[in-house]
Design a protein with these regions (language model features):
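S-adenosylmethionine
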Residues: 95-99, 103-157
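Conserved beta-strand/loop positions that form the S-adenosyl-L-methionine
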Residues: 78-80
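Ubiquitous "structural anchor" signal
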Residues: 52, 70, 91-94, 156
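Class I SAM-dependent transferase core
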Residues: 1-2, 6-72, 76, 109, ...
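Conserved SAM-binding loop of SAM-dependent methyltransferases across substrates and taxa
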Residues: 82-95
Length: 157
């Protein structure tokens, strides 16, 4: 998908959420999508790899939480996987401090690549399990918000 078509599809979907993004932010999403699709060829990150589906089911779905957070919140994304919803939130709200927690180191390497390539700041990755970090005083109660998407049932979280 060319960037012009991508921007058009993103803006159509963003309008429904009353969200406006800059050209730079749209380019970050576009690059993120392309890195995701490329890495997914050699590593199973997601079953959703068609550009229009990535836009709707990964990016837009991740951004639906924006109405519940403030731009200067500190957020931990538990079991982030391919970076959803943490990276989309960070792109939309650049001042937000985000920590991406995942148990698989290969996904952490992917996330580090995305963060570096799309030039995100104040976002870090942590390799580990949520149940271990929940008891670590360096991380416990250091975030305004903890988010998770398709990690475990709510009673487990």
């Amino acid at each position: 998908m060319k960037i012009e078509e991508f921007n058009e599809k993103m803006n159509e979907n963003l309008k429904e959420l009353d969200i406006e993004l800059s050209e730079k932010q749209l380019k970050q999403f576009y690059d993120y999508m392309n890195i995701l699709i490329e890495w997914n060829k050699v590593m199973n990150l997601t079953n959703i790899i068609e550009p229009e589906e990535v836009i709707k089911k990964h990016f837009i779905d991740s951004l639906t939480v924006l109405k519940h957070i403030k731009e200067d919140d500190s957020i931990i994304d538990v079991g982030t996987g391919a970076g959803f919803p943490g990276i989309p939130i960070k792109i939309a709200y650049p001042k937000t401090k985000i920590t991406l927690l995942d148990s698989l180191n290969k996904r952490i390497k992917f996330l580090d690549e995305v963060i570096n390539k799309i030039e995100l700041k104040d976002i870090k990755t942590i390799h580990g399990r949520a149940e271990e970090f929940a008891h670590n005083n360096n991380y416990r109660e250091n975030y305004n918000i903890a988010i998770a998407r398709a990690v475990a049932s709510l009673n487990v979280l």
